């Protein structure tokens, strides 16, 4: 067909139509107030008419699924996706149908077949059909007549291939939904562990993901991965359902069962191993505490009858019942445990009993054979009769043992000494060797922890234990092979234990006799004054005797030091306290210096002598004046007037005192004062430190403070008398 040529102002050159549908002529121009004409459709199929409303204006009718004629309803599960009506514009523009990969429909039907729904779920199916296919719904009013959709438009004629696809965009132009730019093979998805990453839904321009889309587009090839290996490593297999545990059959009390389990945990050893150690009487595997726990595990007679009468499956019993059944395999297992509990500490107990009984025998022998203790008791008897002479307590032939402790409670008139101190003083002056009488009683100290009555009870318990062991030996003869080794070991142990118990029993009898004899030795009744009380009284007397002797020694040392001090100052009449007549606070002041006692020195060394000024009557006293040093003022005289604070210049302070040692003979009125070494007299001087002058040497010249001639000697100390 040749193109139509139109001349004039409205002439339009129309290109030749190759393979296109001829366009209709343009409509006339719209009239005023008339409806706008539809836009020209160039090369497109006219769109189908809009679907009728889903419901009629009155709200009547129902929604049904409308299918195209000749198309069967699918029996597969619905794919709930959002349908786009304006997508694939490029493909529709060029008129090519979309090519889809080939699918295995049988596999899809096997995987996604819909189950047959009951009548109650029909409404749900209709609702799902309405939500899934909104464009295949039509309003039905009145009769149940099916209103089909208009027929589809005719296919577009074929033409040249479409242009290359545009650059991938994570969203379409309208932002309706996310579009994946990677084409993945459609395979059966295995249940793998998900990778919890943060997904990017849109590739930003210039990013790595944008470059990958530009470079590869939909033809991106991934690295070859071993998919079976990934499925093996990261598969989420269905967790096997735990097999239901068989219900345990409780036969014993719940509290008893809990205690049994707790004791098993404390033992920390398999029960069969412990039972084997018990049958072998192995002391290295179990101790006494573990054996006691095992004894608590042993079943009682009622529990044994209950377990024996149980006819059900033994595996359904609880852990505590299983433990009791294991213990019941050995006949009289509790009795065998008690045998081992008796055997383990037996050797230690026998050794301890022998040691204690030997100590008792030694202590009794030492007390009865001590001659020094006998002499001390004789002196105490004589001293008591002296104090009680002429009274009802006098002329005693002896005294009770408790009276030894009263010596430290009887005090002298000055309350500085007790009768125990006097006894030690007499012994120290007349018989010093008796002060160490306690050295003859070395074993007495070890008897404090011994009680013969408790010892007798323990020995009796051991004897009873041996009788029970003999009974178990007789009963184990009928146990059979399970107790053969145990029976042989028990027989040997009983034979050895009987010999040791007999020895200890004989030793105890000897100790008992010696203890009673010791009480008789002091005139006491053994029933009222047992051995424990005798030993405790003697030990208390020894402790008080030592304490009194130590106090006497300290007092004697103090008296010697005091006597030496009085000898230095010429007797008690000329002590410092009486000479100065100071107050008590001044007399007790640490500033009062007492000269040390005389110390002999080699004759080659020079000796220094000084004289001491005796006290005058009335003695002077120290008073506090305005001077930096105290002054000696006679008692009763007024204190010197203080210097004027507002008048002329105050008098100069006196120079500090100087201690000078002089060998000159004392004046006639002081001839009775002895000269002793290291004694000084107080003189006034200008030197701040005392000077010691050697005998025969001239007195030293005082140092000059200004470099000129030395100052004249200072005056004597100021002593004023009334």
Swiss-Prot record:
The UniProt record lists the FH2 domain at: 182-571
List membrane-spanning regions: none
Q: Which PROSITE patterns match?
A: FH2
Q: Which InterPro entries does the record associate with it?
A: FH2_Formin (IPR015425), FH2_Formin_sf (IPR042201), Formin_homology_domain (IPR051144)
Which intervals carry biased composition (Pro residues)?
Answer: 22-55, 593-605, 638-658, 709-722
Q: Which GO terms describe its molecular function?
A: actin binding
Q: Where is this region: Disordered?
A: 1-56, 564-606, 635-672, 690-722
Q: Which residues form a coiled coil?
A: none
Family assignment from sequence similarity: Belongs to the formin-like family. Class-II subfamily.
List, alphabetically, the PANTHER family matched.
FORMIN-J, FORMIN-LIKE PROTEIN 15A-RELATED
Protein name per Swiss-Prot or TrEMBL: Formin-like protein 16
- Protein source organism: Arabidopsis thaliana
Q: Which gene encodes it?
A: FH16
């Amino acid at each position: 067909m040749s193109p139509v040529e139109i001349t004039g102002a409205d002439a339009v050159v129309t290109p030749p139509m190759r393979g296109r549908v001829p366009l209709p002529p343009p409509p006339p121009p719209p009239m005023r107030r008339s409806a706008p004409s539809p836009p020209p459709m160039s090369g497109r199929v006219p769109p189908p008419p809009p679907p009728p409303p889903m419901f009629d204006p009155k709200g009547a009718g129902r929604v049904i699924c409308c299918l195209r004629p000749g198309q069967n309803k699918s029996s597969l599960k619905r794919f709930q996706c959002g349908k786009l009506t304006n997508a694939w514009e490029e493909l529709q523009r060029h008129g090519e149908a979309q090519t889809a990969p080939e699918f295995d429909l049988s596999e899809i039907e096997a995987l996604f077949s819909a189950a047959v729904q009951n009548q109650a779920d029909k409404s749900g199916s209709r609702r799902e059909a309405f939500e899934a296919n909104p464009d295949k719904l039509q309003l039905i009013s009145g009769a149940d007549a099916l209103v089909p959709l208009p027929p589809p438009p005719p296919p577009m004629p074929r033409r040249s291939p479409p242009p290359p696809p545009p650059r991938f965009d994570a969203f379409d132009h309208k932002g309706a939904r996310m579009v994946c730019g990677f084409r993945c093979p459609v395979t059966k998805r295995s249940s793998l562990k998900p990778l919890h990453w943060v997904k990017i839904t849109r590739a930003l321009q210039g990013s790595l993901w944008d470059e990958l889309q530009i470079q590869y587009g939909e033809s991106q090839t991934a690295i070859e991965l071993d998919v079976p290996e990934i499925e093996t490593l990261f598969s989420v297999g269905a967790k096997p359902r735990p097999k239901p545990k068989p219900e345990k059959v409780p036969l014993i009390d719940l509290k008893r069962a809990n205690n049994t389990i707790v004791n098993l945990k404390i033992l920390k050893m398999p029960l069969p191993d412990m039972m084997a150690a018990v049958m072998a009487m192995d002391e290295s595997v179990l101790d006494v505490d573990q054996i006691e726990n095992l004894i608590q595990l042993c079943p009682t007679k009622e529990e044994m009858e209950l377990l024996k009468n149980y006819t059900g499956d033994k595996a359904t019993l609880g852990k505590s019942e299983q433990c009791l059944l294991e213990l019941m395999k050995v006949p009289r297992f509790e009795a065998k445990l008690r045998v081992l509990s008796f055997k383990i500490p037996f050797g230690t107990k026998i050794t301890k009993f022998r040691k204690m009984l030997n100590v008792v025998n030694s202590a009794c022998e030492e007390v009865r054979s001590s001659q020094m203790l006998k002499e001390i008791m004789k002196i105490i008897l004589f001293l008591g009769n002296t104090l009680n002479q002429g009274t009802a307590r006098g002329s005693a032939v002896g005294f009770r043992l408790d009276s030894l402790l009263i010596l430290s409670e009887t005090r002298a008139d000055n309350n500085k000494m007790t009768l125990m101190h006097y006894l030690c003083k007499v012994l120290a002056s007349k018989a010093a060797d008796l002060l160490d009488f306690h050295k003859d009683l070395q074993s007495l100290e070890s008897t404090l922890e011994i009680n013969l009555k408790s010892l007798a009870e323990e020995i009796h318990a051991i004897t009873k234990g041996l009788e029970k062991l003999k009974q178990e030996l007789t009963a184990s003869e009928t146990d059979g092979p399970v107790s053969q080794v145990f029976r042989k070991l028990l027989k040997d142990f009983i034979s050895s234990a009987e010999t040791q118990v007999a020895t200890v029993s004989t030793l105890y009898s000897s100790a008992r006799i010696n203890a009673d004899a010791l009480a008789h030795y002091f005139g006491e009744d053994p029933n009222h004054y047992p051995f424990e009380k005798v030993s405790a009284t003697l030990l208390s007397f020894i402790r008080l005797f030592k304490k009194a002797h130590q106090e006497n020694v300290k007092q004697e040392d103090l008296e010697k030091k005091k006597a030496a001090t009085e000898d230095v100052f010429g007797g008690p009449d000329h002590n410092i306290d009486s000479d100065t007549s100071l107050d008590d606070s001044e007399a007790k002041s640490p500033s009062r210096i007492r000269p040390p006692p005389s110390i002999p020195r080699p004759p080659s060394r020079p000796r220094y002598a000084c004289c001491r000024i005796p006290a005058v009557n009335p003695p002077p006293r120290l008073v506090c004046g305005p001077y930096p040093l105290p002054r000696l003022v006679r008692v009763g005289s007024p204190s010197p007037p203080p210097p004027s604070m507002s008048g002329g210049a105050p008098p100069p302070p006196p120079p500090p005192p100087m201690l000078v040692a002089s060998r000159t003979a004392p004046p006639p009125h002081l001839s009775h004062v002895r000269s002793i070494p290291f004694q000084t007299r107080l003189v006034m001087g200008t030197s701040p430190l005392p000077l010691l002058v050697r005998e025969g040497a001239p007195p030293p010249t005082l140092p000059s403070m200004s470099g000129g001639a030395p100052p004249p000697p200072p005056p004597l100390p100021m002593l004023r008398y009334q």
